[in-house]
A protein has these predicted regions:
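N-terminal binding-site loop/beta-alpha segment at the start of enzyme catalytic domains
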Residues: 1-92
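Active-site beta->alpha loop and helix N-cap motifs at the rims of alpha/beta catalytic domains
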Residues: 97-99
Length: 117
């Protein structure tokens, strides 16, 4: 039996993959996958194991001037995942916006344009 959760109109597995560590270190998480192919392999392994929710954000990036790094990585992994169109249709990629980074600083940017790209 697979546990699922509803996110809006979507039903996904109860366990998702938080992709932030694939792009940036934190105070609790000092490591980062330096190898892009290894990071993509992690995402592929999660999808192959049945994970249907990938969590990303434009602020998940190795540095202040590489915003969008994680979203690009997740998109590349999703596109290169060898799955059927039916399997791909079940995947939800959740992203967030509204936080921006300047050199050495994080700040809020809660304006509609930040969601439009």
């Amino acid at each position: 039996m697979t546990l699922t959760r509803k996110i809006g109109p979507y039903e996904v597995t109860a366990v998702g993959l938080g992709c932030m560590p694939l792009s940036m270190a934190t105070d609790r998480n000092k490591w980062i996958l330096d190898d892009r192919e290894q990071a993509i392999s992690v995402i592929h392994a999660a999808l192959d194991a049945g994970v249907q929710l990938l969590d990303t954000a434009d602020i998940y990036a190795p540095s202040w001037n590489s915003m969008g790094h994680n979203e690009i990585l997740v998109g590349e992994a999703f596109r290169s995942w060898s799955a059927t169109p039916e399997q791909k249709a079940k995947i939800v990629i959740a992203t967030k916006g509204g936080i921006t980074r300047a050199k050495g600083d994080n700040s809020l940017l809660s304006i509609p344009a930040s969601a439009r790209g």
